[in-house]
């Protein structure tokens, strides 16, 4: 009798164990491994491809630990690259243009500041020139996620006033964005996250400032998104030095541009900014204030 009960117990337990094992394997397959497991750890990633986008802009692709890994970067956050250059530790923040929909790699689009091209900065950019000098197969250290803003979807943003504070949740129907130069990368990250979700009806208004037409980073990607999602993504450029045949704005970001190309204050939008500090301090913030956008609804990456 005891032997029969033992056999019966094994017969009952085996299907349960088998089903549990199968479910665990399916769960593991459906849950990709995360590269950035801790924001306090540096993860060396290997350069596997480099694409020349323009005379001074490159797309760098780095391999994640396995083809099944994702980076693990929430939308709105950035990473830090660190390298020892000329005996000194150099750390710089960057926002990837790839997302956690991409497995096995992370892409960075970076403008290379070459030496002897800008009179105020004759040495050029330390990190960007270091990246330019890297060979395929070389590694560089990534750390993150970092940042005070996370986009949670459906118009919901979690924003921390500082690193120690709890996030404040803001839900909006429209987002104003002002980007200058390489400041476009965090904007593109948020725009893509919104546009890929057909149930996210948040409308994005991007005002993108550059010096010349050839300086416009990621223009094909932006215009493809605009053409595909014209009801939800509004795009306007302004150039310091515009060509004669130019269909967009000219000059620095000003009050008129903000009135014409960002959502009005009455819609209670969130306004995101990223660009050179002088642009933010002297062009964006004062003119946003003149138009009526309150400080608490403005965020600078």
UniProtKB/Swiss-Prot annotation:
The keyword Transmembrane helix does not apply. One of its GO terms (molecular function) is cytochrome-b5 reductase activity, acting on NAD(P)H. The modification Phosphotyrosine is found at residue 43. Pfam families: FAD_binding_6 (PF00970), NAD_binding_1 (PF00175). A lipid is attached at residue 2 (N-myristoyl glycine). Its cofactor is FAD. FAD binds at residues 92-94, 109, 111, 114, 126-128, 185. InterPro entries: CBR-like (IPR001834), Cbr1-like_FAD-bd_dom (IPR008333), FAD-bd_FR_type (IPR017927), Flavoprot_Pyr_Nucl_cyt_Rdtase (IPR001709), FNR_nucleotide-bd (IPR039261), OxRdtase_FAD/NAD-bd (IPR001433), Riboflavin_synthase-like_b-brl (IPR017938). Changing residue 274 to A: Loss of 30% of NADH-cytochrome b5 reductase activity. Changing residue 204 to R: In METHB-CYB5R3; type 2. Its EC number is 1.6.2.2. Changing residue 301 to A: Decreases protein stability and slightly decreases NADH-cytochrome b5 reductase activity. Transmembrane segments: none annotated. GO terms for biological process: blood circulation; cholesterol biosynthetic process; nitric oxide biosynthetic process. Changing residue 58 to Q: In METHB-CYB5R3; type 1; 62% of activity. Belongs to the flavoprotein pyridine nucleotide cytochrome reductase family. Catalyzes the reduction of two molecules of cytochrome b5 using NADH as the electron donor. Component of a complex composed of cytochrome b5, NADH-cytochrome b5 reductase (CYB5R3) and MTARC2. Interacts with MTLN; the interaction is required to maintain cellular lipid composition and leads to stimulation of mitochondrial respiratory complex I activity. This is NADH-cytochrome b5 reductase 3. It comes from Homo sapiens (Human). The gene is CYB5R3.
